[in-house]
Swiss-Prot record:
This is Elongation factor Ts, chloroplastic. It is found in: Plastid, Chloroplast. GO terms for molecular function: translation elongation factor activity. The keyword Flavoprotein does not apply. HAMAP family: EF_Ts (MF_00050). Belongs to the EF-Ts family. It holds the Pfam family EF_TS.
């Protein structure tokens, strides 16, 4: 028996995901009207689309400035896309704002991606973890595995793209960006950011 998909549900799905009406209706139909499964289906398809676009050049975009409540913390963010048309879209500006808020919310965030962490920092973190008392009597192989796991966890705390997205902890910042890529149809890249705290001098 064919599942009837009402327009209200399709519109709700479109509003939540940003996908087109026909795409939302198809997702609901394919999942027999199951709303949660339709969302997951669109999310996965969006990420697949985003992965295909990830190699495209991003020479446009904007410098976004965000001042946190109280005016004692500010973020300057450079975020790039492929065309000036997309750079002017509300969805792109919202993305820049939400990422800036993400950075402002967590002072541990220091870099955009894992590749931005220096080799010296990685060495220092590894030395610190190696020296912990609870590992000294462990067999070397087990110790190394534990250390690697702890190092990865420690480094990820510094990385913007690895964070749980503040507006939806079920996804990472990377996954959130991919969702926006699937909506706008262009590659998007967070290039760099600077955090300014009142009274702090580098």
């Amino acid at each position: 028996m064919k599942t009837e998909i009402d327009a209200k549900t399709v519109k709700k799905l479109r509003d939540e995901t940003g996908a087109g009406m026909m795409t939302c209706k198809q997702a609901l139909t394919e999942n027999h009207g199951d709303y949660d499964k339709a969302i997951e289906s669109l999310r996965l398809k969006g990420m697949a689309t985003a992965d295909k676009k990830s190699s495209r050049n991003t020479n446009e975009g904007l410098i976004y400035s965000y001042i946190h409540t109280g005016s004692k913390l500010g973020i300057l963010l450079e975020i790039n896309c492929e065309t000036d048309f997309v750079a002017r879209r509300e969805e792109f500006t919202d993305l820049a704002k939400n990422i800036s808020m993400q950075i402002a919310s967590n002072p541990e965030i220091q870099v955009v991606s894992l590749d931005d962490i220096s080799d010296l920092t990685k060495i220092e973190v590894r030395k610190f973890e190696n020296a912990k008392d609870d590992l000294q009597n462990k067999p070397e192989e087990i110790k190394n595995k534990i250390v690697e796991g702890r190092v990865e966890k420690s480094l990820k705390k510094q990385v913007l793209l690895e964070q749980e997205y503040i507006r939806d902890p079920n996804i990472t910042v990377t996954e959130y960006i991919k969702q926006v890529v699937s909506i706008l149809g262009e590659n998007i890249r967070v290039q760099r950011f600077t955090r300014y705290v009142l009274g702090e001098i580098d």
